[in-house]
Amino acid sequence: MESRDSKIYPGIRRLENDITRRRDAHGNRIAAAQSEQSVAAPYTRTVWVYVPAQYVKGTPAPLLVVQDGHGYLNLVLRVIDNLIAAGRVPVQVAVLIDSGGGDAQGSQRGLEYDTLSGRYSDFVESEVLLRIKQECDIVFTDDPEGRATMGASSGAACAFTLAWYHSERYRRVLCYSGTFVNQQSPPDPMTPRGAWEYHAHLIQEAARKPLRIWLEVGEKDLHHDDPEETWHNWPLANRRMANALKVKGYAYRFTLSLGARHVDPRVAEQTLPGALEWVWRGYLSTVEA
């Protein structure tokens, strides 16, 4: 997919200048206005579509949207294949989407994944899924209970954001090493600490949404020694997310992986089958009923 064809994300890249090189005392980037840290730039985005052999053409398919798709092709597709064959998850189509490139503040990936809004969900719905429907002749279910989303790092925060801002589209979320920290770019005065705001007050203050959420973080994940006031400690942020979800009465699971680091591949290899099975729990029985 070419950026020139997108009405929602025409493309940016981070500038390398004194502003974007700024760091706080703990080495974290400091966000700035988009005009100071980014410049318009084209990108090419790759999207993979996995259609299982069991899919019956023309029937509305349950959907799994995966952020940073290239990083999960082998693992996710192998796991889904095995789970479908065993009848442990619904027959589903997986859409694995690469970001528009770069990372963190000022980048296209940062704009897509770390922004707290419904913008990325609108992009997936109106530009990615619509094109797949047209070009691959696939019908996706409109039932939000039949739509899941997953990712790691900023892709995990993005997966949660997809469901949080559009729970009428997605109800099932799977997150590895979620970037629920102060990394939003450009800054937004409505959510000044970025995804840290989810566990600081957004989850507590909003009416409970019909979401099912699986969270994981490594014990030695990014900035695990940083103090809370940096709003940039991954293990702390994810523990706070789990507590906020618990207090509010959400269906959730939280895994703290001992000794593991950021997006530790050993953790995903060991936990993804059970995580996907738990995320989809209840959907098969509902459909069969």
Predicted regions, residues:
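Non-catalytic cap/lid and distal C-terminal segments of serine-dependent acyl enzymes
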Residues: 1-289
